[in-house]
């Protein structure tokens, strides 16, 4: 689960992670009042107005601006609120700006990158440090890997003092800046583990000319499987920032991820779903979604799955690929027939059913009178999808 920058900073602040003073604003008038308060409390000649959306690259898209007075903050907020911000992470449709973070200005000396996430290859948390703050860390890792330090942290023992110092040394810091960086990194790791985060990313981490070390930006992603331990975090979810198809799918406990292709996929099991998407791509099609109906697929979940797939106007054909282990193929077939009659499937539907009660399921589909295309094997299914698209 993703949250906004200001929410992430509020959480980090509770763990002793240094962040700038900031106030969230939902209107231009609130932005002006926030600026007045910050100007009264700080020496900086500017405040920063930051659009709050679940995407990076806001600065280049015009979502981060400086204001030298409360009146200018009001003007900037008026222009920014309600606009659609398009960045390299939002896609061409962009995201609407509904709230702003008004933050104290910083006298920046240097910018760095600090991030913590799980390294699935080693089953350890990994602390990532780079001298290239403000850059996309993937680009740094690919083009200048020598500027990125990765420190494996054994979850049994946590971040050790020598590891935090190694990170600060890598950044070339000395004296008070060095000590502040060590404290910052230690506090960030404690926050990351305490809240069951999947990612804690500070980009940039700034060192001011006064020697302060602060998180100028913060991105926190929660492990959704651990949210039952942090029920207070659930209220931080902003559904308006999420894909509406994915929100609707979550209501039916369907694992759905929207993609930009033209072939709707309904599969049971994440591994089979990934293989199905690969086969569609290899056959010349493009998957429009990842949809895992799970091991307990019922006629109701199949029907809901069809509704969500058909909500995407880019879908030109649908592939149903079910391997019946725990799931009975006849139950899935019943869901397909029921959904087809209720919804009115006007698109080509290719069905591949294997496993428990597959023969019964195929008979049900044959006798349904519906225009369903049977497939024998995954490769055959993918080829028939491509043929249907070409027809």
Swiss-Prot record:
Keyword check for Magnesium: yes
Keyword Metal-binding: yes
A Pfam family this chain is assigned to: ATP-grasp_2
Residues where substrate binds: 268, 325-327
Cofactor-binding details, from the entry: Binds 1 Mg(2+) ion per subunit.
EC number of this enzyme: 6.2.1.5
Domain ATP-grasp, chain residue ranges per copy: 9-248
Family in the record: Belongs to the succinate/malate CoA ligase beta subunit family.
Subunit structure: Heterotetramer of two alpha and two beta subunits.
Cited function: Succinyl-CoA synthetase functions in the citric acid cycle (TCA), coupling the hydrolysis of succinyl-CoA to the synthesis of either ATP or GTP and thus represents the only step of substrate-level phosphorylation in the TCA. The beta subunit provides nucleotide specificity of the enzyme and binds the substrate succinate, while the binding sites for coenzyme A and phosphate are found in the alpha subunit.
Protein name (record): Succinate--CoA ligase [ADP-forming] subunit beta
Organism: Chlorobium luteolum (strain DSM 273 / BCRC 81028 / 2530) (Pelodictyon luteolum)
């Amino acid at each position: 689960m993703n949250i906004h920058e200001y929410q992430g900073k509020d959480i980090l602040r509770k763990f002793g992670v240094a962040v700038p003073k900031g106030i969230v604003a939902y209107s231009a008038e609130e932005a002006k009042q926030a600026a007045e308060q910050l100007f009264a409390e700080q020496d900086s000649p500017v405040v920063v107005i930051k659009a709050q959306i679940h995407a990076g690259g806001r600065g280049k898209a015009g979502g981060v601006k400086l204001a030298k007075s409360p009146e200018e903050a009001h003007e900037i907020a008026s222009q920014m609120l309600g606009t659609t911000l398009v960045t390299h992470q939002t896609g061409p449709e962009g995201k609407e700006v509904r709230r702003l973070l008004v933050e104290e200005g910083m006298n920046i000396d240097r910018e760095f990158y600090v991030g913590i996430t799980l390294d699935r290859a080693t089953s350890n948390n990994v602390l990532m440090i780079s001298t290239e703050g403000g850059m996309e860390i993937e680009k740094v890792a690919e083009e200048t890997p020598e500027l990125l330090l990765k420190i494996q942290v054994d979850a049994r023992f946590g971040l050790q003092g020598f590891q935090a110092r190694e990170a600060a040394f890598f950044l070339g810091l000395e004296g008070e800046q060095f000590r502040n960086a060590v404290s910052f990194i230690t506090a960030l790791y404690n926050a990351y583990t305490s809240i069951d985060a999947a990612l804690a990313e500070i980009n940039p981490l700034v060192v001011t000319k006064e020697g302060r070390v602060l998180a100028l930006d913060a991105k926190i992603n929660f492990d959704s499987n651990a949210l039952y331990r942090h029920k207070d975090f659930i209220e931080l979810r902003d559904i308006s920032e999420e894909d509406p198809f994915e929100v609707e799918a979550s209501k039916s406990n369907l694992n759905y991820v929207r993609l930009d292709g033209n072939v709707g996929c309904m599969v049971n099991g994440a591994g089979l779903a990934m293989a199905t998407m690969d086969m569609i791509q290899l056959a010349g099609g493009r998957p429009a979604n990842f949809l895992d109906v799970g091991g307990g697929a019922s006629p109701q979940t199949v029907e809901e799955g069809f509704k969500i797939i058909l909500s995407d106007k880019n879908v030109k054909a649908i592939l149903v690929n079910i391997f019946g282990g725990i799931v009975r193929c006849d139950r899935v077939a019943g869901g397909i027939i029921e959904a087809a009659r209720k919804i009115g499937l006007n698109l080509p539907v290719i069905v591949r059913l294997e496993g428990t009660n597959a023969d019964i399921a195929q008979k049900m589909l044959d006798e349904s009178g519906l225009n369903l295309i049977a497939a024998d094997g995954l490769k055959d299914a993918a080829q028939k999808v491509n043929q249907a698209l070409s027809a």
